[in-house]
Amino acid sequence: MSSILIVRIRGSASTPWDLQEVLEMLRLSKQYSAMVYPKQDDIVGMVRKVQSYVTWGELNMDGAKALMARIETVKGALDQSFIEKELGLSTEDFIKKLVDGELKLNSIPSIKLPIRLHPPRKGFKGKINSFIGSGGELGYRGEKINELVRRMV
C-alpha cells in the first residue's frame, strides 16, 4: 500500500456545505493545507468527491523529504531527535514508512495537523479552478504532486 498526498488549492468562499464537511473530515479546512493518508478506497472516494477543491497524487521519497521540513510538532519543527525519541525510528525509516502507508501522521499525538504549505514558487502553471486535463491545477496528478510540494515548501 502506498500513501497519497492531498493539497487543498481553492479557498472556502462559496463552498457547498456537504463538500465543506468532507474537506473538514480530511482535515483540509484552509487553503494550501496538506495531509498524507494511506491509499484506501474510502479516502480516495472522499478525495474524488472534493476533487474540484484539491489536487492529489502518490507521495514518493523525494516529496516526503521536502514535506518533512513543513511538519510541525508541539515543541517546534519535526527533526531527527524528535523522530528517534518519540518513534524510535531513524529519519530514513520514518520517511519510508510514511511513503509506504505503514505510518499515519494522525496517530502521532504531538504532530500538528494539517501541514501548512506556502503558495507555489513561480505560481501555478495553470488555472486553479479547472482540472489537470484541461490546463488547470485541480484533481489527480499522480507522481507530479511531489514536484508541486517541492515548490510549496
From Swiss-Prot:
GO terms for molecular function: RNA binding; structural constituent of ribosome. The lineage of its organism: Archaea, Thermoproteota, Thermoprotei, Sulfolobales, Sulfolobaceae. Coiled coil: none annotated. It comes from Metallosphaera sedula (strain ATCC 51363 / DSM 5348 / JCM 9185 / NBRC 15509 / TH2). GO terms for biological process: maturation of LSU-rRNA from tricistronic rRNA transcript (SSU-rRNA, 5.8S rRNA, LSU-rRNA); translation. Pfam families: Ribosomal_L30. One of its GO terms (cellular component) is cytosolic large ribosomal subunit. NCBIfam families: PRK06049.1, uL30_arch. InterPro entries: Ribo_uL30_ferredoxin-like_sf (IPR036919), Ribosomal_uL30 (IPR039699), Ribosomal_uL30_arc (IPR005997), Ribosomal_uL30_euk_arc (IPR035808), Ribosomal_uL30_ferredoxin-like (IPR016082). Part of the 50S ribosomal subunit. This is Large ribosomal subunit protein uL30. Belongs to the universal ribosomal protein uL30 family. Keywords: Ribonucleoprotein, Ribosomal protein.
